[in-house]
Regions:
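A short, well-structured juxtamembrane/interface segment
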Residues: 1, 149-162
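Glycine-rich phosphate-binding loops that contact phosphosugars or nucleotide phosphates
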Residues: 1-143, 161
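Acidic catalytic cores of enzymes that act on phosphate-bearing nucleotides/polynucleotides
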Residues: 26, 156-180
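A short glycine-/small-residue-rich loop at the edge of a beta-strand within enzyme catalytic domains
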Residues: 125, 129, 150, 174-175
């Protein structure tokens, strides 16, 4: 089994990975948003502890438990205590870019989680490369959302202007439920 620990945007990235891969891998993925790992965690479990700051108490607590259990462990953070623990224990660590708001780091976290699953032999590299393709597309597409782009050519501005003073309701298929 696979356990991804995290709060806020880190948990959101885990939920997206879980949905993205639910028909691709046979191992169950559980997202843990608290201090304690489930009793099902064993030496055969892959525990990925994620915290943008690297200092989230809940994620560090779960990481410490995973190390004590002897689970397979990887970490994701921009810096902080989590990175220090990973270095000290020779644990695989993916370093996220610094200087972002944690929610803005979700896409980086998502990519890190999928790459860890590739490195542990759980996910195919082709599926990870698919993410890179979408990231390139979104990078180019988002240029049209810049403040300097006129309203006529900027769908983000048009949506914002249309939505002003209204309540937003987001509907989604289950595939996109973590994003809704």
């Amino acid at each position: 089994n696979i356990v991804i620990t995290g709060m806020g945007g880190s948990a959101l990235a885990g939920l997206i990975v879980k949905k993205w891969l639910e028909n691709e891998i046979t191992l169950p993925i559980e997202i843990v948003r608290n201090y304690n790992l489930p009793k099902s965690v064993s030496k055969n479990t892959l525990v990925i502890a994620s915290s943008y700051s690297g200092n989230t108490e809940e994620s560090i607590s779960a990481l410490t438990q995973a190390i004590e259990i002897g689970a397979q462990v990887a970490t994701v953070s921009s810096h902080g205590k989590m990175e220090e623990i990973a270095r000290k224990n020779q644990i695989a660590h993916v370093k996220l870019p610094t200087g972002l708001q944690p929610r803005m780091a979700v896409i980086y976290n998502f990519r890190a989680l999928t790459k860890i699953l590739v490195n542990f032999g759980i996910n195919s590299n082709e599926k990870h490369e698919e993410i890179e393709h979408y990231a390139d597309f979104l990078r180019k597409e988002s240029e049209s959302w810049a403040a300097s782009v006129s309203n006529e050519r900027n769908y983000a501005k048009q949506l914002a202007l249309y939505s002003a003073g209204r309540s937003a309701v987001f509907l989604s298929s289950s595939a996109f439920s973590p994003l809704a």
